[in-house]
Each structure stands twice: as C-alpha cells, then as structure tokens.
C-alpha cells in the first residue's frame, strides 16, 4: 500500500502540486495521466524519495518515504544505463545477491534480449535499452516501479511491443507500478487505474479498467472509456477532489 497525504510542492513562487492525496493498493498499475507541466513527474519523484516535498508525506507499507532506496526503482524516458558497463553488469548494479550471467540471460529472454548480456548500451537501439530497464526491474524485484514517460521517445511498433512486455512484467511480479504519461491510449492499455490530473496535480477524475476486457485495444468498452477520458481531458477541470482509495 502506498499512502500519499497532503503533498504540496513549489519551486520558488510557483506551486506545482496543490494538495495531492491518494491511496494505491499493492500490485496495481496506476497511471498519472495529464498534460505536460501539470506536476505529474514531480509527484513521481516525490513518491520515489528523489525530491522532498514542501509539505505532506508518502508512506510505502507504512514506512515513511524520504530518500531513494532499493524498494523503489525508476525507469525514465531516456535510459540511465552506464555506458562503460555491459548489460549484465548494468542489471547487477545495486543487486543485493549474486547472479550469474546465465541467470541474467534467463531474464533477458523475457524481453527478447537473450545473449545480449555482454553487449554495451551504445550497441543497442532505444527500444532495446528500455527493455533492459524492464529486465532490471524484474531482476531487482522492487516494491514499487516508477515509470516517467518510458515509451515516449520510441516508434509506434517498438512502443506497442514494450507495452505488452510491461504487462507481462507486472503479471510476474508483486510490484506496484506507477506510470506517468500524457498518452491516453497508452494509459488505457496498460493501467488497472487511471488518475486524470489537471494543473497543480489536482485530481480531475479516476477510472478503473475492467480486467474482463483483457486490454483488447479494439474492445468497445475501452473505446467508450477513451472518449470519456478525452472529453474530460479537453475540459481540463482543475477542481481538487477528495482523497481516493484505489
């Protein structure tokens, strides 16, 4: 369980987050959906302990979150792999147990990168590097995976492929995944829950995706949901709502 209570944050005189409250159940994929500059990435960094809020608290399994730690793993739009280390060694970074190249290769198979362990990041495409990031998340088994526009810089084919692999990653782990995006289709396909945000990170609305629809991109229910979200997105109401439990 992640409990976010009365988070406010400002940079100088500019308040980025007004008063954010949310409870997130363990093992869900939750998406913060909103336009650029609404504060969603700032909120993600606060949840991960990478940024101290002006006020308010974040608790993960009742433990106050104030600093980065191995229980939270961040995946960015642009990879943060170390260029002088091969893929196996990048995956091992920060791991609290020994893991052989063969064991890592078994994980790399899940993201179609088997036998790439001795390769260096510069030899991989952007999509491959993001697949390494997903593999690292699977190996490290954090409690929370935070993803800030992880697929935004990729072409459509690679993006769809990685979306499918992200869904598989979530099925094979107990991690809670929080995704930041401004892409409505990506949010609908990946999420158990969508939090639609306006300026100041104010919650406009929230949606639960019915699992019976199995993330079928052409499902009529999901198409109706998409139209509903697009309408709310366009209206961009900024009124804060009470704390949600999801």
Please place each PLM-identified region on the residue numbering.
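Conserved signature/switch motifs of ABC ATPase nucleotide-binding domains
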Residues: 122, 140
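Helix-to-loop junction immediately C-terminal to a conserved catalytic motif
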Residues: 48
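Conserved ABC ATPase "signature" region
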Residues: 99-116, 167-168
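Conserved ABC transporter NBD signature motif
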Residues: 56-68
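Hydrophobic anchor residue at the start of the ABC signature
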Residues: 134
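The feature captures the beta-strand-to-loop junction immediately N-terminal to the Walker
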Residues: 33-35
């Amino acid at each position: 369980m992640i409990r976010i209570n009365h988070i406010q944050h400002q940079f100088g005189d500019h308040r980025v987050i007004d008063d954010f409250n949310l409870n997130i159940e363990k093992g869900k994929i939750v998406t913060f959906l909103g336009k650029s500059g609404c504060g969603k990435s700032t909120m993600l960094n606060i949840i991960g302990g990478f940024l101290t809020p002006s006020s308010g608290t974040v608790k993960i399994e009742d433990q106050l979150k104030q600093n980065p730690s191995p229980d939270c793993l961040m995946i960015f739009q642009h990879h943060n792999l170390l260029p002088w280390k091969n893929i196996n060694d990048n995956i091992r970074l920060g791991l609290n147990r020994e893991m052989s190249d063969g064991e890592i290769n078994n994980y790399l198979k899940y993201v179609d990168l088997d036998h790439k362990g001795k390769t260096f990041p510069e030899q991989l495409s952007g999509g491959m590097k993001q697949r390494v990031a997903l593999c690292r998340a699977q190996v490290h088994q954090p409690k929370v995976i935070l993803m800030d526009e992880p697929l935004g810089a990729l072409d459509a084919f690679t993006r769809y492929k990685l979306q499918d692999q992200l869904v598989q990653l979530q099925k094979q782990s107990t991690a809670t995944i929080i995704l930041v995006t401004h892409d409505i289709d990506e949010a609908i396909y990946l999420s158990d829950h969508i939090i639609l945000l306006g300026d100041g990170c104010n919650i406009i609305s929230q949606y639960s995706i019915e699992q019976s629809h199995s993330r079928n991109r052409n499902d009529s229910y999901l198409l109706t949901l998409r139209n509903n979200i697009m309408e709310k997105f366009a209206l961009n109401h900024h009124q804060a709502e009470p704390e949600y439990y999801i």
